[in-house]
């Protein structure tokens, strides 16, 4: 059964948050009681994603399989490819008071992201994001809702003629979202603060072999399509890639406190954002575990507001946002929803799904 959407408003925010944290408390014996770092013991993590389900995202110890993205018979409803990524992280930078202006959470991989990838690609309930379809909406406590038409977030078949893009905010260093979800979109722009970008680029390049369905071009990563067949290396020749479409993949600095898309001069500083508008008909903004203290909420929501206005008015894009939150502070979650709905006038839906409700995470769709 597909997930449902609960339309939140200024009255139902509190009912939703109370119910979700009550669920969380009832599962305290089953769920890890930690801050959510994927693995704080190692500098390099080996992670496998596979169709066997949400357990596929567990870290694999002492395994170094390279370029092992495999596929079986295609299925429109659930992804069939497997992926293995190697993620270099920096525990020392996480603990540093000097690195990246003391904003250091992005130096490690947080567990919200692997969970989201597994759910999006392999959970049957996430099918609307893979197929593009109408989703049932419940308004408050009433069972009489309506349907919301969702464009595809990812196209598993490659047959959809629509051009789709992903803009990732607060990407951190891992780079696993672009190298996996990049297989199913046309343009992917991964952003974070400037101090994070070198390690983010390193991890993307380390795992570029997982982009098995696309030919990748990138100005920021200095990747171009091959034009001449290299002797003795048939695996990467242009002739060997005739059936693959092209992914535009870029990595860019985006400071939520400084962005000003109303200033025309700013546009020239963010050509990657213009790339999404120029190449896509729909865009999903993805932000995983970026709301963990109250100080980030206003800059984040102001950035979303600017992006929505600019991409819709300038390029007429379909615009949706997916925010993943690791449920830590009930007060921070409540404040985020209050500000998003009441102060910034966003339409916010809780994604209601059993798999999510049995985890420490929650996902919100914002339009």
UniProtKB/Swiss-Prot annotation:
A molecular function (GO) term: protein methyltransferase activity
GO biological process: methylation
Protein name: Ribosomal lysine N-methyltransferase 5
Misc. remarks from the entry: Present with 468 molecules/cell in log phase SD medium.
Superkingdom of source: Eukaryota
Gene3D superfamilies registered for this protein in UniProt: Vaccinia Virus protein VP39
Native organism: Saccharomyces cerevisiae (strain ATCC 204508 / S288c)
Example of a GO cellular component annotation carried by this entry: protein-containing complex
Keywords from the UniProt entry: Methyltransferase, S-adenosyl-L-methionine, Transferase
Residues that bind S-adenosyl-L-methionine: 110, 170-172, 192, 256, 288
């Amino acid at each position: 059964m597909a997930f449902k959407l609960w339309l939140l408003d200024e009255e139902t925010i509190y009912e939703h948050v109370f119910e979700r944290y009550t669920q969380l408390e009832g599962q305290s014996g089953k769920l890890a009681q930690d801050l959510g770092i994927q693995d704080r013991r190692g500098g390099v993590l080996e992670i496998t994603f596979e169709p066997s389900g949400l357990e596929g995202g567990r870290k694999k110890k002492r395994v170094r399989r390279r370029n092992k993205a495999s596929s079986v018979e295609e299925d429109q409803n659930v992804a069939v490819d497997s992926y293995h990524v190697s993620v270099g992280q920096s525990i020392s930078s996480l603990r540093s008071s000097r690195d990246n202006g003391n904003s250091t959470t992005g130096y490690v991989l947080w567990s919200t992201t692997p969970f989201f990838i597994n759910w999006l690609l392999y959970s049957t309930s996430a099918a609307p994001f893979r197929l593009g379809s109408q989703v049932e909406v419940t308004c408050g406590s009433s069972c009489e809702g309506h349907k919301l038409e969702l464009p595809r977030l990812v196209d598993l078949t490659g047959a959809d003629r629509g051009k789709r893009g992903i803009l990732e905010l607060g990407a951190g260093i891992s780079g696993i979202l672009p190298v996996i979800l990049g297989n199913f979109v046309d343009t992917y722009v991964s952003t974070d603060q400037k101090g994070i970008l070198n390690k983010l680029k390193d991890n993307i390049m380390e795992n570029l072999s997982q982009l098995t369905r696309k030919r990748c071009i990138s100005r920021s990563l200095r990747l171009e399509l091959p034009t001449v067949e290299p002797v003795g290396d048939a695996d990467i020749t242009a002739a060997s890639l005739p059936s693959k479409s092209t992914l535009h993949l870029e990595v860019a600095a985006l400071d939520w406190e400084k962005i000003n898309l109303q200033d025309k001069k700013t546009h020239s500083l963010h050509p990657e954002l213009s790339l999404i508008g120029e190449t896509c008909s729909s865009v999903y903004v993805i932000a995983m575990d970026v709301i963990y203290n109250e100080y980030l909420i206003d800059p984040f929501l102001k950035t979303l507001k600017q992006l929505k206005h600019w991409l819709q008015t300038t390029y007429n894009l379909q615009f949706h946002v997916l925010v993943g939150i690791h449920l830590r502070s009930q007060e921070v979650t409540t404040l985020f929803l209050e500000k998003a709905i009441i102060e910034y006038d966003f339409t916010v839906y809780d994604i209601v799904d059993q798999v999510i409700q049995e985890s420490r995470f929650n996902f919100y769709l914002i339009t």
